[in-house]
Amino acid sequence: MQSSERFSEPSVPASKRRLGDDDPLMPPASLLSKFNARLLNPAEAATLPGQRIRPSVYIADRLLVRPNGHYPRSRDLLGQAAAGRGLRLVEELPPRDGDAPSIRGAVMRLEPDDFRPAQVDAWWVIQDARALAGREEPLVGVGLDHLMFATPVVANPYNSPNPYNSPNPYNSPNPFGGWSPIAQYAEPGGGGTQPVNIVLPKPVRQDPMCGRRPVIAVIDTVVLDHPWLREGILTGVTLPGGEIIGFPEFMPAPDGDGVGPLDGLLDPFAFHATFISGLIRQVTPDADILPVPVVRPDGVIIESELLHVLDQVYRLAALHSTGNAGPAIDVVSMSMGYYHESPADVAFDSVMYEALLKLGELGVAVVASAGNDATVRPMFPAAFTPHAGGPVTQPPPNAVPIVGVGALNPNGTVAMFSNSGPSASAWAPGAAMVSTMPITFNAGLNPTSAMIDPSGQRRESPHLDDFSGGFGVGSGTSYAAPVFAAKVANELLTQAQSSGGIPEHESVEHAVTRGRHAVGALVKW
């Protein structure tokens, strides 16, 4: 394929996009500098003939390269391009050697060569490498290391990175002008985070089970303590050699101020995976949950770190599929995403799609949130769900397809904040959800009024960040995705009833068939 052919159908210019295909506001400079990230601005970025790009955010000094037969050539072209800009290309993380199954690509780092000043910009190096590759044999499997963000509705998106984890309209009326119907989802009483009382009993798990339990890997933050989550949470899981799963060091502060300004507020994503796990427990109490921490307490995920944990999940699933010890993995729940600079071209250079496809080829159903920017612009990985005109147009023949999930209001209508279009092939409740919160959380907010009454009892107005009661409210496609993932697990259990339950070990072909049937029962492609 010629490089001119690759860009022969450029993305539609802004003036001709369909209604709702808007670019969300980009993160502020303070967030970019924290992660050595750059904003790709279409008005300023270098482009090739016929190429149109859209805003995105990426790590300035890193590149991702797919682990395939093109790797040596891609590495050499990138090295030449880097040298032309006074930079040196370093293999920060080379492709995994040996026969062990892996989906991890290479992470390449750029740094100034010798003692010369140089501007480090991965986008320029990729574009130069594409030009060096020429029209006859274009550069394949090379991409930016994007900055990604988790996707609930939070009231302070600039404390966490607006707009990817929650767009600006959630906490202020901009850009809609005046009062915003979207902003209310972040307010207490409208679906925003606040403590609540519940009188429901703890979900009951069958014991013993007929067959093994389905396992849902929650790729998110650290799961924290709650009475509902003290069984069926697979902690201490390691890979051969003792390799720890995920980044458990991304631990939030229970009393606030772990990240962001010194304002005493809870880290905006401190409770994220705990809330998600509670939703899964409510929908499918018989499933086990494997926490895979990769989201920082401020909601930021670096794509290369996500690929690292996806590789760990893949290796766990592959080990189990060959009869080795360790947990099976049936479903992956991902409440995060990013906007690709060239959405029509993303499957061509995406290391992430290759990783998610390989999981699907093991029979793992990958479920991703559609995003909260009230746009039809594709958010990835949710937009890898099969759809006409997208990077994946049909369900892959030998894999479980990826599902992107949008959020519904309590009355079944689409939540005003939810992305739709290419990112949403399925829908699930995601607004004004009630779930588990870490019981240790009590940060800097205080009741607006408090007193000791004549009987000696303490009286208070609502204490909006005291979650010692263990439950809270939240909104976002972040919460629709795990609800749908739990429904997939339930479908796996239902379909296995006639055959004595989910088998402890099975062929990959059987696992793929089970996964496709479970997803197919819930999504009509």
Region spans (language model):
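Autoinhibitory propeptides
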Residues: S3-P24, A29-I59, L63-D76, Q80-G191, ...
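Loop/turn elements at helix/coil->beta-strand transitions in domains of secreted/extracellular proteins
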Residues: P138-V140, R212-V215, P285-D288, P327-V331, ...
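A cross-family glycoside hydrolase active-site/sugar-binding cleft signature
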Residues: D145, P293, S333-G337, V367-A370, ...
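Solvent-exposed loop/turn segments at secondary-structure junctions
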Residues: M148-A150, V222-D225, R296-D298, G337-E341, ...
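Active-site core segment of subtilase-fold serine proteases
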Residues: P161-Y170, P175, W179-Q184, P188-A287, ...
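Extracellular S/T/G-rich loop segment that most often corresponds to the catalytic His/Ser-adjacent loop
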Residues: D220, E243, T385-L493
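Substrate-binding/access-modulating region of protease and related hydrolase catalytic domains
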Residues: V295-P396, D465-P482, H517-V519
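C-terminal subdomain of the subtilisin-like protease fold in secreted/lumenal serine endopeptidases
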Residues: G323-G337, N398-I402, L493-W525
